[in-house]
Regions:
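Glycine/proline-enriched, intrinsically flexible loops and inter-domain linkers
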Residues: 1-261, 265-267
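Acidic, low-complexity intrinsically disordered tails
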Residues: 272-276
Length: 276
């Protein structure tokens, strides 16, 4: 992880001189997980190792990459299907982690989360990661990305490591599980300047909550008669939406755009065409 931190420090330094060339921080850790023991089904001892991808930082021209590989080696982990065939484990889910992307004009990529359950025998588990306290930083008013998370589920109880993302030799038996979530990337630019349709799509895909869309991005959403998720222009007096309009008009003024004071600006911000 030291090389990741060094890289981020250098990027921050370069961002002072060339703000439009440097992305926000990536997830910066691979959230290593190891489990070992005796497999009574296959009749042999085993050690399973897994690391996670995470979100890259948003950058000047687009959102960050979701579930990107570790930047140190660019290595890829084994597929969960292969590991289920080789070891006494079952992955109950492996998915993008909702809300983990740092908000921004160009948001960070999403981190991942998975829950793996021991299906037979006994073993010991260990985790080694980072970013459990501070998420990947954002740039130019972008928000911090989501943090790493680790949970052990043993005997029906939830256990979080004392050092959040670091623990070793945790006894596990059949039925116990471990949940590991990787960080999302930091956001780039002010979230209030994000394209409204991009916000709507993230909510539609259940990657962002409707409340976060309203309070962070200033986008109010509702369902139309066909059940499609659309921007609710009738609620344009909501404080968050008014703030978004004011922010965007301010940006237009700073950039010297024509018609920045025109009342049509609010309609332009809120209008999203409804797809058939």
């Amino acid at each position: 992880a030291s090389i990741e931190r060094l890289t981020r420090v250098l990027e921050i330094a370069v961002a002072q001189a060339a703000p439009d060339l440097v992305p926000a921080a990536s997830f910066g850790t691979v959230s290593n997980f190891t489990i070992g023991g005796f497999d009574p089904v296959r009749g042999k001892r085993y050690i399973m190792f897994r690391f996670s991808g995470g979100g890259y930082g948003g950058h000047p021209i687009s959102d960050g990459l979701t579930n990107g590989c570790g930047a140190i080696s660019m290595a890829r982990t084994s597929s969960i299907e292969v590991q289920e065939q080789l070891y006494p484990v079952r992955f109950e889910y492996y998915r993008m982690k909702q809300g983990s992307a740092g908000a921004g004009k160009n948001r960070g990529g999403f981190g991942t989360e998975y829950l793996v359950r021991l299906t037979a025998g006994e073993g010991v588990g260990s985790v080694m990661g980072d970013r459990g306290v501070f998420g990947p930083y954002g740039l130019h008013d972008g928000h911090e990305g989501g943090k790493a998370e680790v949970e052990f589920h043993r005997d029906g109880e939830r256990f979080v490591p004392r050092h959040i993302t670091k623990e070793e030799v945790i006894p596990l038996k059949a039925g116990d599980a471990v949940r590991i979530a990787s960080p999302g990337g930091g956001g780039w630019g002010n979230p209030l300047e994000r394209d409204v349709e991009a916000v709507r799509k993230d909510v539609e895909r259940e990657l962002l909550g409707a409340d976060e869309a309203r309070t962070i991005y200033g986008v109010v959403l509702d369902r139309n008669e066909q059940g499609r998720l659309v921007v609710d222009a009738a609620r344009a007096d909501a404080p968050s939406v008014s703030g978004r309009v004011g922010q965007l008009i301010g940006v237009a003024r700073r950039e010297g755009r024509q018609g920045a004071d025109a009342p049509v600006a609010e309609a332009e911000v809120l209008a999203v065409p409804v797809e058939d």
